[in-house]
Amino acid sequence: MSFGSCSRHALFTPGALPGSFRTMTTSCVKRVYTAQIRGGDALGKRLPSVSSFPGQLPRHGSHFQSLAFFSTSRRRQTPPPPSPPTTSQSPTVPSKASTTPPTSLNTSKPVATESQDKTDWSIIAKLAGNIWPKNNPNVKFRVIGALTLLVAGKVLNVQVPFFFKTIVDSLNVPITESTTVWVLAGASIAGYGAARVLTTLFGELRNAVFASVAQNAIRKVARETFEHLLNMDMKFHLERQTGGLTRAIDRGTKGISFILSSIVFHVIPTALEISMVCGILSWKFGWDFAAVTAITMLLYTWFTIKTTAWRTTFRKQANAADNKGATVAVDSLINYEAVKSFNNEKYEVAQYDTTLKAYEKASVKIATSLAALNSGQNFIFSSALTMMMLLGAQGIVKGTMTVGDLVLVNQLVFQLSLPLNFLGTVYRELRQSLIDMDVMFNLQSLDSATKDSPTAKPLHLKGGEIEFRNVAFAYHPERPIFRDLSFKIPAGQKVAIVGPSGCGKSTVFRLLFRFYDSSSGQILIDGQDIKTVTLDSLRRSIGVVPQDTPLFHADILHNIRYGNLEATDEQVYEAARKAHVEGTIQRLPEKYATKVGERGLMISGGEKQRLAVARVLLKDPPVLFFDEATSALDVYTETELMRNINSILTGQGKTSVFIAHRLRTISDADLIIVLQDGYVAEQGTHEQLLAMPGGVYHGLWQAQLTESTQPTEEEIERQREELEIVDEKKKQQT
C-alpha cells in the first residue's frame, strides 16, 4: 500500500459548485455529496457527530418556507436583520413616559464585545440550568452518561491511527509464501475495525442518551416563553407583530438545539481531541510536531472566526430580504380578495420579486465569500500538512521514525480536519443562536404592566354593580381618552354605552377587563377595586362579545366550546340555539365539524358574531359585555337574537353592558350612558334622553333617522312613532 493512497483518507475539500462538497477516500475516488445549502452557504457540510441528533442544526438563512410564522397584516418597509441586541435595545415594556416604544425584536446596531460576552455567558448559564436541573436526578444521570460516552468515543477515535500505524509497519516486511495477513496484522486489523465500530456506536449512544435532555430543555423554555407572552398586557401585543413573536420563539428553540449539539457534540469533543493529539505528538515525536499542530489549529481558528464574522454581514442582508419577502408574501396572500378586487397581481409580484432580487444579491456574496473561506482554510491546513510530512520524512531518513509513524501523524492531523472543516459554520451559527436565544430570553424577562398585586384576593360578586370613579386614561399621553370619568352601572340591569366614534366606548370594557390599567381613579365591582383582585377571578366573572370576533382555525364545535372547555356537546348545542345559529350550522355539510378557517374567514361576519354570542353564553358569567355584537346581522336575525339575549338577562338577573352605534338596538335599556370628550355627557332612559332636544343622544338619534344609509322604511316609521309618543308625553306634562 503506497502512502499516497492512504494519506487522503476523509479529507474534505470544497466543491466546485455551491451546495456540494467533495470527499477524498483512500482510493482517491471522488464522491460528490450534494447537501441542501441555503444560498450556497456552508450549512450543507454535515457534522458527523450531530447528524442523528434529534434537534439537528437549525437551517437559519433564507428559507421562504417560514412564511407561516409571519401572520402580520401590516407590511414592514425595512425589516430588521437579526443582530445582537444591546441591553438598552432589548425589547422591554416601555415606560409611561415613552412615546416611541420599541416594536422590533431585533436590532442591527453593534454591541460592545465585553458587553456581548457577558450576555453570551448569561445565556449559557440560563441554558445550563435547564439541562442540569436541581431536582431531577434522571436528567443529570443522562448528562453524565452522555459526557462519559463522548470521552470514551474520542479516546477510541484517537486509537484508530495507532492501529493504522501498526498495520502499515506489520506489512512493511519481506513477504513469503507462508505469510498471511492475519499472521502479520490480524490483531491490528481487528482492533482497527473494532475501534471504528465502537467509536460510531458510542457516538450514536451519546446522541440517544442526550436527546431527551435536549428536547426537554427546548420544550421547557418554549413553554415558559409562550406562557409568559400570554400573560403580557394588551399594549405589548398591540405594539409587536405576532409573526415576529412566533418567529422569535421558533428561532430561540432552534438556537437551543444548535448550541447543545455544537457545544456538547462538537466544540468540547474537538477541543478534547486537539489536546490529546498535541499531547500524543509531543510525547512520541517531539515538541516540533506538537508546535506545528498547535500553531495550525490557532491560525486556522483565528482565520475562520474573522472571515466568518465578515461573512455574517451578508447573512444579515439575506435574512433581512427573507423577512421582507415573507412579510410581502403573507400580506398579499392574506389580502387575496383585495389584490383580486383591484387587479394588482402584477404589483404584488413585482414587490415580491424586489425582495427576491435583494436575497439573490446577498446569496451571491455568501457564495463568493464561502469560496474565500474554504480557500484560506485549505491553504492553512495544506501548509501544515506539508510541514508535518517534511518533519516525518526527515525522521524516517534519520531512522527515528517508521513509515507507520508517518501514517500515524498524517491520520491524527487529518482526523482534526473533519471537525475543523465545520468551524466556520459552527461559529457563525453559534453566534446567531446566542442572538436568537437572547431575544427569546429577553421576552421572558419582560414585565407585564397589568398583573396581580402581591395582596390580590379573588373577586366576590354580590350582584355585579360596576362603578367608574374619577377614571383617567390615555393610550398615548398626547391624546387622553378619559379625563375624569365617573358613572355607575346598577347590578342586574341592562345598560347601554353610546357616543360618537372615538369617545372610548370599547375602552370601558378594556379597562374593566384589565387589558389596560387606568392612570388614576378607581374601577369597582361590588365595591371591590379591580386592581386588588386576582386577574383570573376578575376575567372569569366577565364575558364579552367583541365587535371583531376572534375565532380559531378549528371546527365550530371547538370555537363555541372555547367559552367553557369542560362543557358537554349538548351544552354547546343549547348555546348555539340560544345564539340563533343552530339552523345555520345544521345546513352546513359537516355541521358542527365544519372548519371556520383562519380567523373565521370561511364564514360570514354575522355567523362569526353569533358564534361569539354562543361562546359567551356557554361561559355564563355574571357580567356580560356586548360590543357591537349584532352589527353584522340582518334586521330579522338581529331581532330574534336580541330577544333571546334579553330573555336570558331577564331570567337570570345578569348585569349587561351594550356598546352600540345603532341606537334602536339599545332603546329598551334600563340606563343609557352617553360619552363625549372623555366625560359622561348624559345618562338616562331612551325616553328621557330623547326629551332633551339639544342633547348628544337626541342628535345621534336624529342623525340616524335622516341618514340615507339607515335601514328600512319600517324601522324609520317605528322610530318616528317613538318620537311622537315622547312629544305627546311632554305636552301632557306641560
UniProtKB/Swiss-Prot annotation:
Keywords: ATP-binding, Membrane, Mitochondrion, Mitochondrion inner membrane, Nucleotide-binding, Transit peptide, Translocase, Transmembrane, Transmembrane helix, Transport. Its EC number is 7.-.-.-. The keyword Signal does not apply. InterPro entries: AAA+_ATPase, ABC1_TM_dom, ABC1_TM_sf, ABC_transporter-like_ATP-bd, ABC_transporter-like_CS, P-loop_NTPase, Type_1_exporter. The keyword Transit peptide applies. It is a multi-pass membrane protein. One of its GO terms (molecular function) is ABC-type transporter activity. Residues 72-114, 708-734 are annotated as: Disordered. Residues 1-55 form a transit peptide. GO terms for cellular component: mitochondrial inner membrane. Gene3D superfamilies: ABC transporter type 1, transmembrane domain, P-loop containing nucleotide triphosphate hydrolases. Glutathione binds at R311, T312, T313, F314, R315, N374, S375, G376, Q377, G424. It comes from the Eukaryota. Residues 56-142, 211-259, 306-371, 428-734 are mitochondrial matrix. GO terms for biological process: intracellular iron ion homeostasis. Residues 165-186, 284, 391-405 are mitochondrial intermembrane. CDD domains: ABC_6TM_ATM1_ABCB7, ABCC_ATM1_transporter. Residues 466-702 form the ABC transporter domain. Residues 93-114 have a biased composition (Polar residues). It holds the Pfam family ABC_tran. Its main location: mitochondrion. Homodimer. Belongs to the ABC transporter superfamily. ABCB family. Heavy Metal importer (TC 3.A.1.210) subfamily. This is Iron-sulfur clusters transporter ATM1, mitochondrial. It comes from Cryptococcus neoformans var. neoformans serotype D (strain B-3501A). The gene is ATM1.
